[in-house]
């Protein structure tokens, strides 16, 4: 099962839906009826995905469709994308600057690129009678840390995002799954 969850198509697809994940917490807290249904993609998550990929799996960046348009409302964007959500070139440029900033920070770089580090590691565990899954961005075995990469439009508002997206429950679930303390890098 874990090997299958390494592939995004299984982790996010039907196979992965048999497990609860931190993404389900908001649904469970606010309106459990749509539990298990796919979420509509939004630009912020697409940008976050690009950021993760640029740091953890740069060989997969070619899978992102990038449009040189000023906004998603332009005629050119709509004609090229055919309704598909795509990255805008200026979003990619800004994200590449964020990647450079993170990777030139010595502490961040050493935690991300340490000697005994794994990327995109899936985990499954029974927690309080339910099967949960998670995929750790980075497991640094030397530091005994799970590292989760986050993007934010405004770092001063990150604490509100942490509440909104239930990072506290994510930290708990991942500590149960992987046995290390979790930190967030934004």
Name what the model sees in each region.
Residues 1-133:
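Metal-dependent nuclease catalytic cores that hydrolyze phosphodiester bonds in DNA/RNA
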Residues 116, 121-186:
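Mg2+/Mn2+-dependent nuclease catalytic core
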């Amino acid at each position: 099962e874990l090997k299958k969850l390494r592939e995004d198509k299984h982790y996010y697809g039907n196979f992965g839906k048999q497990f609860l994940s931190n993404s389900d917490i908001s649904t469970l807290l606010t309106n459990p009826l749509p539990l298990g249904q796919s979420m509509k993609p939004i630009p912020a998550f697409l940008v976050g995905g690009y950021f993760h990929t640029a740091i953890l799996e740069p060989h997969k960046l070619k899978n992102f469709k990038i449009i040189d348009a000023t906004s998603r409302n332009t005629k050119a964007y709509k004609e090229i994308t055919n309704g598909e959500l795509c990255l805008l070139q200026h979003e990619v440029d800004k994200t590449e600057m964020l990647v450079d900033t993170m990777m030139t920070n010595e502490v961040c770089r050493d935690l991300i690129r340490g000697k005994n580090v794994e990327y995109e590691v899936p985990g499954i565990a029974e927690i309080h009678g339910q099967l949960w899954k998670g995929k750790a961005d980075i497991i640094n075995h030397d530091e005994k840390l799970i590292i989760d990469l986050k993007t934010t439009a405004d770092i001063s508002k990150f604490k509100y995002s942490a509440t909104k997206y239930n990072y506290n429950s994510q930290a708990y679930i991942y500590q149960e799954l992987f046995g290390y303390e979790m930190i967030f890098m934004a």
